[in-house]
Amino acid sequence: MEQKYEEDIQKLQQEIEMLEAEQEETLRSIFVQHGDRLQQGVKSACEERGGGGAQQHAVSKLITEVRELEKDLRRQTEINGITLNECFVKTLHKSERKLVQQLRLAGHCGLLLFQVEFAVTEIQEDNVLHRRVTELNIVVDGVEFKDFSAFVSRVEDTKDLLLFFRTLRTFSERCEDRRQTFQHFQEKYPDVVNLPEGCRSEIMIIRSPQLPGISMTLFWKIHVSKEGVVKPLLDLLLKMPDQALELDTKKVMEKGSDYFQSLLQLLGVEASIEGLIRAVCS
């Protein structure tokens, strides 16, 4: 009977520790999401109550801690380009040797919105701490996701969370490069450049106002390898009426894509697109 009581007491102690850990994690999450409002609320309460020296010191210390948390978050955002809007942590199991936590992170990297849910298991063996991700689910929202979906699926299978965040920033930067380039040429040549799916898509159509039926379609995909290597892939499709094709004795239309690839290597992306547009306008 005594042994049973000891076991019950031990279980209660473990539950208390888990609840305390959850409380601490909840407060940390609240600071992440509502730091500004908390800081203002604490200031208002202090001003209304007047408070003694000890109370004011405690409030001042709390405000300082909130500010430090905010500075750390801003610093991390500047370093990795990722902004977190939500951070939730829940302890599922806690003992002397093992800790299991469920986490949910939501935010954005550039124009890409993401939500990541994962479980982390920590096991203490002698003086060595083993930590691994045991579950992983990733949701990325944006028109660019079709270029990213295969990579995300593989990351979910391998549970390589660090690879996902490293690749997310590079992928987001390449998407932004494409968006800015497309938008630039559409604004510069509104009568020639058409973006049927918007400036965040992978397609640009170049049409000549003087030569109906002749067009160039630029495909700008962003490929992500299974190792997380991000590489832009550009291709060109030329189109003209059948009658004009019969006069194309030099096979310009047939070899147009190869010519464009050579142009990319020599001049780069923006100068190559500029050359295509000027050729159509001339």
From Swiss-Prot:
Transmembrane segments: none annotated. It is found in: Nucleus; Chromosome, Centromere. Residues 1-80 form a coiled coil. It comes from the Eukaryota. Disulfide bonds: none annotated. Pfam families: CENP-P (PF13096). Keywords: Centromere, Chromosome, Coiled coil, Nucleus. Probable component of a centromeric complex involved in assembly of kinetochore proteins, mitotic progression and chromosome segregation. This is Centromere protein P. It comes from Danio rerio.
